[in-house]
Regions:
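Short, high-confidence coil segments that cap the C-terminus of an alpha-helix
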Residues: 13, 61-62, 92-97, 188
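A conserved hydrophobic position in a structured secondary element of the catalytic/binding core
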Residues: 20-21, 75, 156, 203
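Conserved core of the sugar-phosphate nucleotidyltransferase
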Residues: 75-170
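Conserved alpha/beta core of the MobA/IspD/sugar-nucleotide pyrophosphorylase nucleotidyltransferase superfamily
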Residues: 145-217
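Short phosphate-binding loop-to-helix
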Residues: 17, 23-85
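N-terminal glycine-rich phosphate-binding loop and ensuing alpha1 helix
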Residues: 1-19
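Hydrophobic/aromatic residues located in beta-strands of well-ordered beta-sheets
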Residues: 16-18, 65, 99-100, 127, ...
Length: 217
């Protein structure tokens, strides 16, 4: 199962807990030796679901939480570790950052696909905006070779996760269907880490077909 494959990918880093609203997934997790938490089915985003799970687990306020989505079966542990390292740095330096995430260079062809979310960064590697559109637009050039493609890995402390989930859903979040825009719309910062990754999420039937071909190798 994909969620188990994803959990196994990151299990060497630290404790893995699967958050789900499905009893079937709870049973699967138990069968494969993973802890799981049953959450409400009414959440609008995966981050809201993780927040409920974290509160059920009664973790400390400064505990580092990494949200790896269950449809990322090829995510490399080096990518997750890079996000963990940046969250630790933010804690140590007491930086005013709500979320940490990551990105990689993607081709212009991939950037055309709205399922590949693009991110624009400021000079401090914080996110200015995320979009399904092909951004930034280069007025004076017909084509740009690479874009910054967002990877759906999010790092928080328990406190920053709770704070994020207290924010009201924002207009841009609802337009783009990108929950991370909620933080930016409310004036909070998202730190971005550049990584090298061949991973891809399973968002379309084509993605699933590609994944199945890889699994069979």
């Amino acid at each position: 199962p994909m969620v188990i494959r994803t959990a196994r990918q990151v299990s060497s880093l630290d404790k893995v807990v699967i958050a789900t609203d499905s009893q079937e997934v709870i049973d699967l997790a138990s069968q494969y030796g993973f802890d799981a938490v049953l959450t409400s089915s009414s959440h609008n985003s995966g981050t809201d679901r993780i927040n409920e799970a974290v509160n059920i687990l009664n973790l400390n306020e400064d505990e580092i939480i990494i949200n790896v989505q269950g449809d990322e079966p090829f995510i490399e542990i080096e990518v997750v570790q890079a996000v963990i390292n940046r969250v630790k740095q933010i804690k140590e330096n007491n930086e005013d950052i709500m979320i940490t995430s990551c990105y990689k260079e993607i081709s212009s062809e991939l950037a055309d696909d709205p399922n590949h979310v693009k991110v624009i960064l400021d000079e401090h590697s914080n996110a200015i905006y995320f979009s399904r559109a092909k951004v930034p637009y280069h007025r004076d050039h017909h084509e740009v070779s690479t874009y910054s493609g967002h990877l759906g890995i999010y790092g928080f402390t328990k406190k920053s996760l709770n704070d994020f989930c207290k924010l009201n859903s924002s207009k841009l979040e609802n337009i783009e269907k990108l929950e991370q825009l909620r933080a930016i719309d409310n004036g909070h910062k998202i730190a971005m880490v550049k990584v090298i990754s061949k991973s891809f999420g399973i968002d379309t039937q084509e993605d699933l077909n590609n994944a199945l071909r890889i699994f069979k190798k």
